[in-house]
Amino acid sequence: MINPNQQQVIALAAVVQAASLVEQLARTGDISGDASDPLLQAVFNQSPENFHDIYGNARVNLSVGLNHLNSIVGRTGRDINPDVTRYTLSLLLLERKLSKRVDMLKTLGNGIHSASRQAEHFSIGHENTIAALADLYKSTLSNLSFRIHVTGNPTYLQN
């Protein structure tokens, strides 16, 4: 059984992993399914029975986020990617703004449920599933007053 502090670290590692994948996708146009699938599965798991059900084996499934988080808060400060740190902080700020919008939270929940049907039909990382989530983002979160500015290769950013 993990305590609340460990749960918070794991949740933060998931945010850092998402930010890291955004940076990697913007720079290279590709991300690892091993790193992205656990995050997508967590999005679609809207009724977990316990905390472990959200991310499974966090040491394996969130290793990218845990390693980067360790770089950020570790004493050495080596290998800190400023873009990943900026995206992480931006995601946390966006979450704070979203938490005040009950209407948008409900819309997101319904949209995630709809996108989960795409994931069941195709696969969790299939382009149709990702497109459904991207459309959901465009119709909800992108309308908040705060926007995350992603930098990278213009070719990949257009997609």
What label would you give each PLM region?
Residues 3-6, 82, 139:
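Residue-level signal for the start and early helices of compact helical domains
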Residues 156-159:
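Alpha-helical oligomerization segments
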Residues 109-112, 137-148:
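Extended amphipathic alpha-helical scaffold segments
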Residues 150-153:
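Aromatic/basic-lined ligand-recognition segments
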Residues 41-134:
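Long amphipathic alpha-helical segments with strong coiled-coil/leucine-zipper propensity
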Residues 1-75:
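Leu/Val/Ala/Ile-rich N-terminal alpha-helices, chiefly Sec-type signal peptides and the beginnings
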